[in-house]
Amino acid sequence: MPHLLHVDSSLATESSTSRSIATIFAEAWREAHPDGIITYRDLSVTPPPHLDWATVSARFTPPEQLSAEQAEAVKKGEELIAEVEAADEYLLSVPMYNYAVPSTFKAWIDQIIVMGRTVRQAPDDSALTGKKVTVVTAQGGSYGPGTPKEGWDHQQPYVAHILAALGATDIEFIRVEMTLAPVNPALAEFIDLFQRSKAEAAAAARLRASV
């Protein structure tokens, strides 16, 4: 049966744009796959541990030679890796923080990337090979061509490259821009742009979830 892994990373709850669009996707996915499974992980509630040397060194040590510290470190990330390996579709909700991704999302990525396991030399044999990935992003401003901060987006390019390293090729980004417009008077002229962007993202999420 279809199995969706839904990962949220916004620190906000009710006011989060990325969460709201991801919820629309998840609800539409449930309607399209009534017998499907959704595994949900909220990185703001249960932040993954940042990498330490015990974890890194353990990945290059035979299991029977692991120290107690290494074994404990590996155990912390094993649940996250198992969730990725069990799913066949992914919904990642990733707001932009300081022009990049939340630190909890980066920590999650660092935990699930394991050379020789989730990332393999053969491009068609990694954890996300042949699987569908939808990434919902929310950005306080706009960073496209011709904007004052063109080139400042270190969020989407990073996520795209990481997913490619994990073997994903069926990737769609659903982005909402100018999320700060309703709360920052200096950006008030862009409220209509934000509302239009959010409506388009909601429609894109419903469509993507249903196919």
Curated annotation (Swiss-Prot):
GO molecular function, one term: FMN binding
Superkingdom field: Bacteria
Gene: azoR
Keywords: Flavoprotein, FMN, NAD, Oxidoreductase
Role description: Quinone reductase that provides resistance to thiol-specific stress caused by electrophilic quinones.
Details of cofactor binding: Binds 1 FMN per subunit.
InterPro entries linked: Flavodoxin_fold (IPR003680), Flavoprotein-like_sf (IPR029039), FMN-dep_NADH:Q_OxRdtase_AzoR1 (IPR050104), NADH:quinone_OxRdtase_FMN_depd (IPR023048)
EC number: 1.6.5.-, 1.7.1.17
Essential cofactor(s): FMN
Species of the source: Frankia casuarinae (strain DSM 45818 / CECT 9043 / HFP020203 / CcI3)
Entry binding sites for FMN: S10, S16, T17, S18
Family: Belongs to the azoreductase type 1 family.
Uppermost EC category: oxidoreductase
Known partners and oligomeric status: Homodimer.
Reaction catalyzed: 2 a quinone + NADH + H(+) = 2 a 1,4-benzosemiquinone + NAD(+); N,N-dimethyl-1,4-phenylenediamine + anthranilate + 2 NAD(+) = 2-(4-dimethylaminophenyl)diazenylbenzoate + 2 NADH + 2 H(+)
Membrane-spanning parts: none
Protein name: FMN-dependent NADH:quinone oxidoreductase
